[in-house]
Amino acid sequence: MAITKGNKIVLVGTGAVGSSYAYALMNQGISDELILVDLNEEKAKGDVLDLNHSIVYAPSPMEIKFGSYEDCKDAALVVICAGAAQKPGETRLDLVHKNVGIFESIVGNIMKSGFNGIFLVATNPVDILAYATWKFSGLPKERVIGSGTVLDTARFRYLLGEEMNAAPTSVHGYIIGEHGDSQLPVWSSATIAGTPIAPRLTDEKKQEIAENVRDAAYKIIEAKGATYYGIATGLARITRAILKNENVVLPVGTLLEGENGHDDVYIGVPAIINREGVRQVVELSLNDEEKEKFARSVETLKDIQAAIWS
């Protein structure tokens, strides 16, 4: 069966991340139909009302409604932001056992509707839950996408832009690996205007930037309870790449099948994104140190996968 076309989106989970994502979609005019699904019906219906009052000032018309899993039947994209929340001091990987069980139920209900589109997963630990979504759905790997390191990469580019006194949009570089503590910056390919950035920074400064990227979520959670604006905007960017068939490179969570020497793991890597999902993984030329760190990140995730699916 051909993949579902159109631009209807079903959002499962209207907490801080989900509602921020819905707001970003509306403000950017990415879709003309959005269905909100949440166990807390009153909260979701409140979001629907609030968002509909904003459409008057949005760039394009958009139909926003409360719905159910049945609405996934003809959806082009289902975005999952539902799950147990991350608590202060708790790592993303601490969440895994709680959220895999939740996802088995969510994905099962979505597939029962006849859904034949693309999944975009944002709930943490996102690499494990994207893998779980792929397992539970039975869909081809290219049609199950995790948010991967799209947010970590944004943080990296922002900090590099601050350091280089340049717009972050002019900085090119990636964080790859787990969306979590074992992630790594790819200094060997970070550039501005085609010029390598790494030689212009001390080892201490590079370490400081890497740590600030890695620890950003913990600092934000400690300060305000959760992170949501950054990831919501990143999800909107991935959504636009899918629905507009952009063939753009974004650092997302996708299944490796031999790329960079690894397989059977969902992990954050640059990939070409279009209307079919992940068209192709872009293999970065890593130096020996980066290869070693990436392998450790892969093993971190595989150890968790083994504990769940052994």
From Swiss-Prot:
> What CDD domains does the database record attribute to this sequence?
HicDH_like
The UniProt record gives the binding positions of NAD(+) as 17, 38, 43, 69, 83-84, 105, 122-124, 147
Look up keyword NAD and say if it applies. yes
Reactions mediated catalytically: (S)-lactate + NAD(+) = pyruvate + NADH + H(+)
Check the record and name the InterPro entries matching this protein.
L-lactate/malate_DH, L-lactate_DH, L-lactate_DH_AS, Lactate/malate_DH_C, Lactate/malate_DH_N, Lactate_DH/Glyco_Ohase_4_C, NAD(P)-bd_dom_sf
Chain positions found as Phosphotyrosine: 218
Read off the SUPFAM superfamilies from this record.
LDH C-terminal domain-like, NAD(P)-binding Rossmann-fold domains
Record keywords, A-Z? Allosteric enzyme, Cytoplasm, NAD, Oxidoreductase, Phosphoprotein
Which GO annotations describe the biological process of this protein? Answer: glycolytic process; lactate metabolic process
Which residues does the annotation say bind substrate?
86, 92, 124-127, 152-155, 227
Quick check: keyword Ribosomal protein in the entry? Answer: no
Top-level division of the source organism's lineage: Bacteria
Instruction: Note how its activity is modulated.
Output: Allosterically activated by fructose 1,6-bisphosphate (FBP).
Taken from the record, one Pfam family name reads: Ldh_1_N
Naming one, the record's GO cellular component terms include: cytoplasm
Q: What is this protein called?
A: L-lactate dehydrogenase
**Organismal lineage:** Bacteria, Bacillati, Bacillota, Bacilli, Bacillales
Q: Which gene encodes it?
A: ldh
